């Protein structure tokens, strides 16, 4: 990714300009999330940079200010900056804390990539879904309107999703192409992972309701 398109560099430059600091930083990236998976890797990177540099450079901006800066980089950035599980409204900037059970997840990426721009601009995408209220939300009844559109046009996603559902509750991430399956134990997730086809990227992760980055920064600031 060229620097002008890299959210890490963009986030650092925005913070520099906002705070008038002349300080800099070097970045080393260890890529773990699959490309084009719909897991918010770019947004998470941007949020991490804003939070870490705010501490490193001692610019001491409040979280709400960092979230506003992050919103200009992407709708998903604020939730990573706030660092807690949340019910999102608007374009993603209106957050209400929401703490589901911390399950284990098998995350799989079929051998394809999905264009987020194409999905959001598609005339086939459902746009009249009833609005959900945090007070009466049942997470089991929620759905991803993008999922039905993606599986209609991408057999790789459709086939993998159908296979995973036989083992555990499974859904697509965002606009895809990753699918996450929910398990009560890491052993259960790993057992199914061993059965996956060789061309499917996968990893097992534990759901967490609070960001470990926030905890680490609190320790540094003590």
Show the residue positions of the predicted features.
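N-terminal beta-alpha supersecondary unit
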Residues: 1-23, 203-220
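Conserved active-site and cofactor/substrate-binding residues in soluble primary-metabolism enzymes
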Residues: 3-10, 44, 114, 155
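DPxDG-like acidic metal-binding loop motif
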Residues: 8, 37-65
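Conserved hydrophobic residues forming the short capping helix/wall of the S-adenosyl-L-methionine
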Residues: 12-16, 54, 168, 193-196
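Short pre-catalytic strand/loop immediately N-terminal to key active-site residues, enriched for Gly-Thr
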Residues: 25-37, 170
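ATP-dependent small-molecule kinase catalytic core of the GHMP/sugar-kinase superfamily
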Residues: 59-169, 182-222
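Conserved glycine-rich beta-strand-loop-beta hairpin in the small C-terminal domain of fold type I
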Residues: 176-179
């Amino acid at each position: 990714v060229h620097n002008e398109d890299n959210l890490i560099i963009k986030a650092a430059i925005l913070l520099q300009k906002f705070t008038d600091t002349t300080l800099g930083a070097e970045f080393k990236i260890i890529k773990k999330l699959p490309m084009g998976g719909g897991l918010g890797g770019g947004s998470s990177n941007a949020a991490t940079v804003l939070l870490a540099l705010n501490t490193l450079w001692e610019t001491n901006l409040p979280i709400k200010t960092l979230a506003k800066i992050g919103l200009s980089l992407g709708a998903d950035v604020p939730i990573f900056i706030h660092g807690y599980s949340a019910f999102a409204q608007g374009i993603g900037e209106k957050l209400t804390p929401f703490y589901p059970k911390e399950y284990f997840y098998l995350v799989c990426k079929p051998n394809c990539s999905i264009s987020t721009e194409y999905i959001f601009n598609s005339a086939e995408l459902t746009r009249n879904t009833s609005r959900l209220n945090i007070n009466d939300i049942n997470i089991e009844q929620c759905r991803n309107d993008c999922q039905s559109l993606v599986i209609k046009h991408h057999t790789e996603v459709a086939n993998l999703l159908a296979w995973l559902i036989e083992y555990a509750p499974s859904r697509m991430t965002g606009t895809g192409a990753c699918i996450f399956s929910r398990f009560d134990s890491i052993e259960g997730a790993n057992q199914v992972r061993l059965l996956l086809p060789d061309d499917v990227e996968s990893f097992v992760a534990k759901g967490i309701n609070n960001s470990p980055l926030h905890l680490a920064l609190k320790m540094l600031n003590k």
